[in-house]
């Protein structure tokens, strides 16, 4: 999943039954045409991937609640059974948002600018977590006590839906969401509020109306249904199993060799990346 074959890999398998599953947009993890052509099935959230063997699909990702990353160590604080049997947590706080103080790209810049406007508008009613703000170990602690969470994806595109949204459902938290443009293919439209962080004034008006209408209090059933869907239908293993169920196991096996990904980091690409990062650093400086 999202890892390139680093060395040639050979195995006995029907070529049609080799599977690649991607979980990042093209600008983060790109794949060449020659690389994806090696696989019989490609499940991808990258809309520009073409071919009869390509299936557009939401990323296959784990959830990040119930996992403590404190001090660089990974500790599992809640099992599947814990999450499945857990009742709705006590909601003592209003809104949380996770971001970081990184400001290298336009996406970083837009997200930070939006969060600053949220802080100015909501004051102590909103808690901001992430690098450069309030640190945390287990994402459960920044979702479970809150009625609402503002979930901001790293990019906005069809099919790019990550744990930023689904973790909200595991904690029975109502998501205010920027990201996947066809999320309603997976979750009902009444299960989240879609906003545009590039239009902060309109987004804040929508959030205010959401809170005023007590949407969280009136969404218990739909949030519970989405929680079950995340845990039972969209967990990693279930998604892999569904793909495997579509394969034809009667196809004859042969010796198949998957070749490594060609190098893509040319000097031109590196220069463009550095220029982009420095541009947004300069733009973020006061008076520039």
PLM regions: where:
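Pol beta-like nucleotidyltransferase catalytic core
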Residues: 2-21, 33-127, 139-149, 156-288
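Terminal end segments
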Residues: 5, 27-28
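Active-site beta-to-alpha loop of glycosyltransferases that engages the nucleotide-sugar donor
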Residues: 24
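Short acidic loop-to-helix transition motifs that present clustered carboxylates
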Residues: 27, 133-135
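Short loop/edge segments at beta-strand edges and connector loops
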Residues: 130
């Amino acid at each position: 999943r999202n890892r390139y074959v680093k060395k040639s890999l050979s195995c006995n398998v029907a070529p049609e039954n080799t599977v690649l599953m991607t979980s990042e947009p093209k600008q983060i993890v790109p794949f060449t045409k020659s690389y994806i052509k090696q696989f019989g099935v490609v499940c991808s959230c990258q809309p520009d991937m073409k071919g009869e063997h390509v299936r557009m699909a939401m990323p296959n990702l784990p959830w990040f609640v119930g996992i403590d990353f404190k001090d660089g160590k990974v500790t599992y604080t809640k099992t599947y059974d814990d999450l499945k049997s857990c009742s709705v947590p006590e909601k003592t706080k209003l809104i949380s948002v996770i971001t970081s103080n990184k400001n290298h790209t336009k996406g970083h810049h837009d997200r930070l600018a939006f969060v600053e406007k949220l802080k100015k508008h909501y004051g102590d009613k909103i808690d901001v977590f992430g690098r450069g703000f309030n640190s945390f170990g287990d994402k459960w602690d920044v979702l479970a006590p809150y009625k609402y969470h503002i979930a901001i994806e790293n990019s906005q595109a069809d099919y790019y839906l990550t744990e930023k949204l689904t973790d909200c459902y595991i904690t029975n938290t109502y998501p205010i969401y920027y990201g996947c443009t066809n999320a309603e293919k997976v979750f009902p439209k009444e299960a989240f509020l879609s906003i545009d962080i590039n239009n902060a004034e309109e987004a804040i008006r929508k959030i205010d109306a959401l809170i005023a209408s007590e949407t969280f209090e009136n969404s218990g059933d739909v949030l519970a249904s989405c929680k079950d869907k995340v845990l039972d239908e969209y967990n990693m293993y279930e998604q892999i199993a569904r793909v495997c169920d579509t394969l034809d196991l009667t196809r004859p096996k042969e010796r198949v060799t998957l070749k490594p990904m060609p190098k893509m980091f040319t000097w031109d690409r590196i220069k463009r990346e550095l220029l982009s990062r420095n541009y947004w650093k300069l733009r973020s400086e006061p008076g520039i």
